[in-house]
């Protein structure tokens, strides 16, 4: 069955306060060959208030051995034929495997929740003022919380549920990691670009949530997204169509370029 995850013993522990979130385990994805991105990103992460962060070596798509090892861990799933870019741009595979690497850490160690950031993050200038308010108003039952994202729907709310792209700033719970792991690896057509797989899971959940026979009825995949568009700022405006990625309170820095694909 597609979009399926087996029943498991959940860990229903969530950050209760914004301070809890800032003190939560935080992993920052960074390639070994990009130390300058880490140096810059680390300063931003410290300034944002995160105190329990740790750099994680990203799976380098330019290293075939790392790719092979990563796919072996996942059982060498087939690639979806329709996503030509997933094969054409191995950086997409590296991104996929890097996030699975962190989800595996969460699952193996039964970590209740973890902040996952990519090294090109930029925080909204009013992050310290806005983020605590957003967090206080976020329901504490999520599998995934998007601190930043690319909205694929018109939101009229500060905190919403809807399909989004991007993986640069997320909070993933143990329950979320378990669900994402299985939902993404059980696709009959194969795996493809990671945020495309996640957004398809979101759309499926929204379409089937009222179906009495749906898995999502009894054990839903639950996520929330922070909509920062109520607080415009010039720093979110970037070339190469990157501005659309910056709809939350955490943005992606276009000046670093992309290790995922050419732009």
What residue spans do the PLM features occupy?
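An acidic/histidine-cluster motif and surrounding catalytic segment
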Residues: 1-117, 121-263
């Amino acid at each position: 069955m597609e979009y399926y995850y087996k029943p498991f013993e959940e860990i229903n522990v969530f950050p209760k306060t914004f301070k809890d979130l800032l003190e939560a385990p935080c992993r920052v994805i960074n390639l070994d060959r990009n130390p300058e991105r880490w140096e810059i990103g680390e300063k931003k992460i410290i300034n944002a208030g995160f105190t329990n962060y740790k750099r994680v070596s990203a799976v380098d798509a330019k290293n075939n051995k790392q790719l092979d090892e990563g796919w072996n861990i996942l059982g060498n799933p087939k690639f979806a034929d329709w996503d030509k870019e997933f094969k054409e741009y191995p950086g997409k595979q590296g991104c996929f495997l890097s996030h699975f690497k962190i989800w595996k850490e969460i699952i193996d160690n039964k970590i209740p929740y973890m902040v996952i950031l990519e090294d090109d993050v930029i925080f909204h200038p009013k992050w310290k003022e806005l983020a605590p308010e957003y967090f206080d108003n976020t329901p504490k039952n999520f599998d995934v919380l998007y601190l930043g994202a690319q909205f694929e729907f018109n939101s009229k709310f500060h905190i919403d549920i809807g399909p989004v792209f991007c993986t640069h700033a997320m909070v993933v719970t143990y329950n979320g990691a378990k669900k994402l792991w299985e939902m993404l690896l059980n696709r009959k057509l194969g795996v493809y670009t990671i945020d495309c797989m996640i957004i398809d899971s979101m759309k499926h959940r929204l379409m089937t949530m009222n179906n009495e026979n749906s898995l999502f009825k009894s054990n839903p995949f639950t996520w929330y997204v922070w909509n920062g568009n109520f607080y415009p700022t010039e720093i979110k405006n970037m070339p190469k169509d990157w501005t659309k990625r910056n709809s939350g309170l955490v943005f992606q820095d276009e000046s670093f370029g992309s290790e995922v694909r050419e732009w």
